[in-house]
Amino acid sequence: MTEEHVVLLDEQDKPSGTLEKYAAHTLNTPLHLAFSCWLFNEDGQLLVTRRSLSKKAWPGVWTNSVCGHPQQGETTEEAIIRRCRFELGVEITDLTPVYPHFSYRATDPNGIVENEVCPVFAARATSVLQVNSEEVMDYQWSEFKSVWKSLLATPWAFSPWMVMQASDEQARERLLNYCQR
């Protein structure tokens, strides 16, 4: 995969340039565009992934299925499809926004800051996973309600963006409705 960049955003969340992804994630990360996607299988189970230990931010932490950054000139939907293929080796369908205006700022234990405008989507996996071990060290298909209980009981074991996304009542309801259809 070619070197990824992030799309930098101004105070009005409008694109203002790009920066190499690795250089962007520092102790003073500029605001940039990202996405988060929650994948479900045909049985309505959620794919929860554990970030590789080689990740710069939140290594080894459990998180939602796939996250990433749209490249300049790429739609969020195109970026989600690209990252699902790269990280999980999976094809998806029924890509649906569930929390389109999510944004957050969080600092990991190493001091690396995430500072993202990060629309959240749900999608359905349509093929068998072929996980990229440089991105994902473990994964599990689980019932959404079980994952929610785990997030409430042990939020420190999960990425802050996953906890924040699921903590939004409207987003949680949309995810629950999505997995039940």
Curated annotation (Swiss-Prot):
CDD domains tied to this protein: NUDIX_IPP_Isomerase
Enzyme Commission number: 5.3.3.2
Catalyzed reactions: isopentenyl diphosphate = dimethylallyl diphosphate
InterPro entries, per the entry: Idi_bact, IsopentenylPP_isomerase_typ1, NUDIX_hydrolase-like_dom_sf, NUDIX_hydrolase_dom
Pathway: Isoprenoid biosynthesis; dimethylallyl diphosphate biosynthesis; dimethylallyl diphosphate from isopentenyl diphosphate: step 1/1
Cofactor(s) essential for the protein: Mg(2+); Mn(2+)
Active site: C67, E116
GO-annotated biological processes: dimethylallyl diphosphate biosynthetic process; isoprenoid biosynthetic process
Cell compartment(s), UniProt: Cytoplasm
Sequence ranges assigned to domain Nudix hydrolase in this UniProt record: 30-164
Protein residues bound to Mg(2+): C67, E87
GO MF entries: isopentenyl-diphosphate delta-isomerase activity; metal ion binding
Binding residues annotated for Mn(2+), in chain numbering: H25, H32, H69, E114, E116
Cofactor binding description: Binds 1 Mg(2+) ion per subunit. The magnesium ion binds only when substrate is bound.
GO cellular component terms given for this protein: cytoplasm
Alphabetic keyword roster: Cytoplasm, Isomerase, Isoprene biosynthesis, Magnesium, Manganese, Metal-binding
NCBIfam families: IPP_isom_1, PRK03759.1
Function according to Swiss-Prot or TrEMBL: Catalyzes the 1,3-allylic rearrangement of the homoallylic substrate isopentenyl (IPP) to its highly electrophilic allylic isomer, dimethylallyl diphosphate (DMAPP).
The protein's assembly and partners: Homodimer.
Family stated for the protein in its record: Belongs to the IPP isomerase type 1 family.
Protein name, UniProt field: Isopentenyl-diphosphate Delta-isomerase
Species assigned in the record: Salmonella typhimurium (strain LT2 / SGSC1412 / ATCC 700720)
Lineage: Bacteria, Pseudomonadati, Pseudomonadota, Gammaproteobacteria, Enterobacterales
